[in-house]
Amino acid sequence: MSIEIVPHAAAHVGAVAAFNSRLAAGGSPWSFYTDPLPDWIAPRPGQAVWREYHVAVDDAGDVRGAYALKPQTWLVHGEPRTVADWQGPFSEGSVDAKFTTLGLRMLRDMLKKYPLLYSWGHGGNEQPVVQMLLKMGWVMHQTPFCLLVLRPSRFLRLNALLRSSLLRRLALDLGAYSGVGFVLLKLHHAALRLRHACRFTATATEVPAFGPWADELWHRCKARYAAIAARDAASMNALVPAMGWPAGIRLKVDRRGQCIGWAVVLDTQMQGDARFGTLRVGSVVDCLADPDDTGEVVAVATQFLRRRGVDIVISNQAHPAWVRGFAQSGYAVLPNKRMFAPSPALRALLEPFDETARGLHLTNMDGHGPMAL
C-alpha cells in the first residue's frame, strides 16, 4: 500500500471524517479537522503567520494520517526566519499496527517542508512523542507555569486536577470550608509579592484591535529578544481576530502617556475541564514589552482579570524577564511544566542555545495557540 502526503482539500473531507471515525472506534481520543480551510489564521497573501493542513492518503483514497503546521516569521538574533509549529501527527497507527511507522514518516515530511520546526507543549519526558523526538536528536527545553489564585475557596473545591483521589478531595474540602486554605493561599501569594516589593504605575485600556501603536512598540523592543515570533500589528490582528477564536481581550498598557506594552487575556468559564473543573479561569495568553517593563504589564493585566471576577490567573512563559514579571505580582512560578522542543536545524540556528534560551519569548499564543483556554 502506497501513501502520499498531500495538502488537505475539499476532495478529502469525506475521507478525513472516515479517518476520525476509525480512530474513535479504536479508542483514540484524537481527530483531525474535516474542513480543509483553517478557522484560525487561514493562509492569506502577505500574512506573516498562517496554518496549513496536510493528510496522508493511500492509493484507495483513504486518509491514514494527518498533521497541521503553523508557519510564522520569527526574528532570531535579529534576522527574519520562517519557523513552524506542528500539531500532531495523527496516525491510524494508534489503533492499527499496520500504520505504526506513519507518524515518523509524517514528522520527517514536516521537517522537509519546514526544517526550522518546533513544538511547544508536552506533559513529560515519558510521553511517546517526546521519546521519539529525543531519539531523533531534539532538545527539550523546560519552561515554567505561572499561577495566581484569586479565590482560594473556589480553587480548592473546583480544581479537578488536584482532586484526583478521595483523600485529596477530603483534604481540599476541609481546607476550603474551614478557611485554612483561604488564609494559607492568600498569605503565600502575599509573601511572593512582598519578596519583590515592586510598585507599578502603568494603566491598561481595552482596545478593539492592534494599531500603529503596536507597530511602534514592536520596532522599539524586538531587538531586546534573542528569538521571538513577529508581534507587529498585522500579525497580532490575524492571531487575535475581531470575531471568532480566540476571544482575546486586548489591553494596551501605557505609562506617563507612552505605550510600554500590551497583553492579550482570556476570561473562560470552564465546564468539566480535566485540569480546572468548573473554575473561572483568567489567562494571560500573550504579551509584549521591553523586558524591563514586564512587571508593569503583568500587574495591570492581573488587575483587569481580578476585577472581572476570575478564580485564578494562569500563563505559560519562557523568557526569564516575563517569569520575573509574573513573580513580582505574586504568582507562584512552577518549574518544568512545559517543553520547548526545537528541531536540530532550529536548535543550530539558536546557538549558543543556553544563552539564546534566556532571550526566547514564548507564550500561550505561540505553538497551537491558547487551546483549552
Descriptions of predicted regions:
Residues D35, E52, P71, L117-A190, ...:
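Active-site/acyl-donor-binding loops of N-acyltransferases
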Residues Y67, Q87-F90, G103-L111, V130-L134, ...:
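Short, well-ordered alpha-helical packing segments
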Residues D85-S94, K112-Y118:
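Short acidic, glycine/Ser/Thr-rich loop/turn "cap" segments at secondary-structure junctions
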Residues I3-P89, G123-G124, A202-C287:
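A conserved beta-strand-loop-helix scaffold within acyl/acetyltransferase catalytic domains
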Residues V95-K112, D292-F304:
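Conserved acetyl-CoA-binding loop-helix of GNAT-fold acetyltransferases
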Residues H189-T203:
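Low-complexity, charge- and small-residue-enriched intrinsically disordered regions
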Residues M1-A18, R22, G309, V323-R324, ...:
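Non-catalytic N-terminal targeting/anchoring module and adjacent flexible stem/linker
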